[in-house]
Amino acid sequence: MANTTSAKKATRKIARRTAINKSRRTRVRNFVRKVEEAIASGDQALAAAALKAAQPELHRAASKGVVHANTASRKISRLASRVKALAA
């Protein structure tokens, strides 16, 4: 348990940041899931639209420090290649 005033404030800030980060992480997962489902259904147009929506969300999470920048880039790259494969 925090004893000093500054430690109590730090605890409050951490709790607030954790909630925000959790929300962002969940949001990213939902967008990625929509792309995965569209790929699984085989609908190229739907998958491309879902990827277009997921891409900025992943970049935003990376810029906010929720996920590592390389992780975001890797996920986008792999999803994009799978969406592109649907068109072939």
From Swiss-Prot:
Sorted UniProt keywords: Ribonucleoprotein, Ribosomal protein, RNA-binding, rRNA-binding
Biological process according to GO: translation
Entry-linked Pfam families: Ribosomal_S20p
Gene Ontology CC: one annotated term: cytosol
Record-linked InterPro entries: Ribosomal_bS20, Ribosomal_bS20_sf
UniProt cross-references to Gene3D superfamilies, sorted A to Z: Ribosomal protein S20
GO MF, one annotated term: small ribosomal subunit rRNA binding
Function summary: Binds directly to 16S ribosomal RNA.
Homology family: Belongs to the bacterial ribosomal protein bS20 family.
UniProt name for this protein: Small ribosomal subunit protein bS20
Phylogenetic classification of the source organism: Bacteria, Pseudomonadati, Pseudomonadota, Alphaproteobacteria, Hyphomicrobiales
This protein's encoding gene: rpsT
